[in-house]
Amino acid sequence: MKKIWYAPYKFESYGEAEIKAVEESLRDGWLAGFGPRTTEFEQKIAKEFGKKYGVFVNSGSSACLLAIASLDLEKGSEIITPSLTFSTTLAPIIQLGYVPKFIDSELTTYVPSVNAIIEAITSKTKAIMVPNLIGNKPDWELLRRELMRMNRSDIFVIEDSADTITSTEDSDISTTSFYASHVITAGGMGGMVMFNKKEHKKRALMFRDWGRIGDNSENMDDRFTHSVDGLPYDYKFLYGVLGYNMKCAEANAAFGLVQLERFQSFKNIRRANIERYLENLKDVKELILPDDSIKPNWLAIPLQTKNRLELLQFLEKNNIQTRVTFAGNVTRHPVYREYLQDFEVADTIMKNGFLLGAHHGMNTDDVDYVCDKIKEFYASK
């Protein structure tokens, strides 16, 4: 019996074209991610998101950290973020010394309303960090208009779009992920943070590349324009921030460029799978289906039911891989207990929510099989 995976498995999402591109990259002699393929990948992904600059990194989690670090906010600043989230959307807020201001989300969209965001704003609010969770989006355009109406254009809007690739010109900074389970992948890993302001990009590069002030120029006139205590010093080894090593390899960019060419076809398959799920399950009264009104590029099909564990056990026994809805109410997890709060929707989804595959490695027969098994489960009750 075929296994229905939550995410593309093995060769369901890549093939000879990606393998050839990686081989060509290696034969060209590029290893570190400073070559022409990385530059091209950064430019093309940034364009998809409506941003001017892209910085290729090793994961979406790293992209989220660099997004916040690039702003150089005052310690203790508040950053509004939803309780229904993924852990590494939240973690860098705390790691970098800022204060998360949690809000709830909406039951069938899985993202917060603009009203919820606006009502959480205080004089200490310096940024908003919201994920396009499972691929759905809040109304970023309305949020930007409301911030302008409030004369709070000082608040940075960060869009964590790890779960999907989309165009959101109304955010200041966007991040995305190329992890193996996502819409496209850069060889199983990778992420990108994207900016409109060059100074934010420059600061992100410093944090990505060990904290160094310099870039990859080999020009001696560039390299020795700085000094340390009066000593002219190579800015390739001059450090301005407490940095990291978050680079990806050139081969990852080569892989990602081929995937980007296939993005529209992947997206179309996912859309067809989502619509088939919704049609097949519309009469299953035990399920809460997602709000698909804006036709988002869903990462997976999010569902809710009151007897989740029993259903998931049944599906797994029938070779259907399942997932819960990420962190649910993240403040209930061990590492975040000091922020513990009740959130009606996040708590409900933590209790009842789950995800099933709708990816481009699946076909209509796969979706029908999953739906038939769900109906079989409820028919036995």
Q: Would you name each region that the model predicts?
A:
Residues 69-161, 165:
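PLP-dependent aminotransferase-like
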Residues 156-187, 192, 199-202, 235-238:
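Conserved active-site segment immediately N-terminal to the catalytic lysine
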Residues 56, 81, 102, 193, ...:
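Conserved SAM-binding loop
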Residues 91-93, 183, 251:
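Hydrophobic/aromatic ligand-binding patch that stacks against planar heteroaromatic rings
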Residues 1-32, 240, 357:
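N-terminal "arm"/small-domain region of PLP-dependent enzymes with the aminotransferase-like
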Residues 11, 154, 166-167, 183-184, ...:
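Short secondary-structure boundary/capping segments
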Residues 36-44, 48-54, 115, 119, ...:
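PLP-dependent aminotransferase class I/II
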Residues 31-78, 92-95, 102-104:
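Phosphate-binding glycine-rich loop
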